[in-house]
Amino acid sequence: QMADKDENVILCTTFAAYDWVREILGDTDTFTCRMLVDNGVDLHSYQPSAQDIMKIANCRMLVYVGGESDTWVSDALVESRNENIVAISLLDLVGNRALNEVELEGVEEHHHHDHDDEDHDHEAEPADHAEGEADNTDGQNAAEDDHYDEHVWLSLKNAIVCTETLADAITELDSDNAKQYVTNAKTYTGKLEALDDDYQTMRDAATQTTILVGDRFPFLY
């Protein structure tokens, strides 16, 4: 049983995750969904303030990307001393659906990190921690995921996977509203599936198959 109202907060580091959780929660009042990062803040260069650490210390769930832009998460979880938190990485949720970043000749590399050649296995399960056990991986997930494109939410199929798995994780914390969470998630993923079908229909009917963009990062998915 959660001790106080602050612990009923679900924090998200990206608007996409915030939107998914908000759709799952619907009109239920057990949890409050909030953004950790303020409007206009660039997540690629964001570092949590002492106030942000306090927010993490008092939340019930943290949904973050799990890539090179938020390697600070592991340290923040340790500093927060929140033993009951459920920390969920989006890259872990999509698992093998995550795409490798591709270095193209002539494209400026904005995020440079050294990578080894070992294979990395991503389980399609949330980084859910048992009661009393915080995420103390010391950035292991983030370090392993550095060469994957973080913008997983740009794929509607990924959005469906994330929504369904987040709904399962939230249901684990609040079984009383489980039916409503599942119903809300199904309604939302139905809309995503319809939109994905519309995109596929448009693509199949297209006479031009080449798109010229100015930045590869947002469009890999």
Segments (PLM) and residue ranges:
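Extracytoplasmic metal-acquisition and chelation regions
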Residues: Q1-Y221
